[in-house]
Amino acid sequence: MYAIFQSGGKQHRVSEGQVVRLEKLELATGEKVEFDSVLMVVNGEDIKIGAPVVAGAKVMAEVVAQGRGDKIKIVKFRRRKHSRKQQGHRQWFTEVKITGIQA
């Protein structure tokens, strides 16, 4: 059984017991969270597709960790001008463990 849900503007395909890295959620480690915006649920041959969400479906999860991702570098380079600008960025994330899928 797996489900596709939406969080932080992105869609994630998950199954029970899986650990997923999401955009930052303002929750403490160990807190439980439910995602109501479930787009699709597949249980064997039974497929439920929402328009746009599946009514009554939920994905339950528990917050495992909060952190920051790897640094990415942004470089702006102007040729022949002896000028360049370099900047770094680390995005915050929340790791959650999927505890259940309710269809």
From Swiss-Prot:
Gene Ontology MF term list: rRNA binding; structural constituent of ribosome
Entry GO terms, CC: cytoplasm; ribonucleoprotein complex; ribosome
A biological process from GO: translation
Domain of life of the native organism: Bacteria
InterPro entries hit by this protein: bL21-like, bL21-like_sf, Ribosomal_bL21, Ribosomal_bL21_CS
Keywords assigned by UniProt, alphabetized: Ribonucleoprotein, Ribosomal protein, RNA-binding, rRNA-binding
Assigned protein family: Belongs to the bacterial ribosomal protein bL21 family.
Free-text function comment from the UniProt entry: This protein binds to 23S rRNA in the presence of protein L20.
Subunit record text: Part of the 50S ribosomal subunit. Contacts protein L20.
NCBIfam families noted in UniProt: L21
Record's protein name: Large ribosomal subunit protein bL21
Organism field: Haemophilus ducreyi (strain 35000HP / ATCC 700724)
Encoding gene (name): rplU
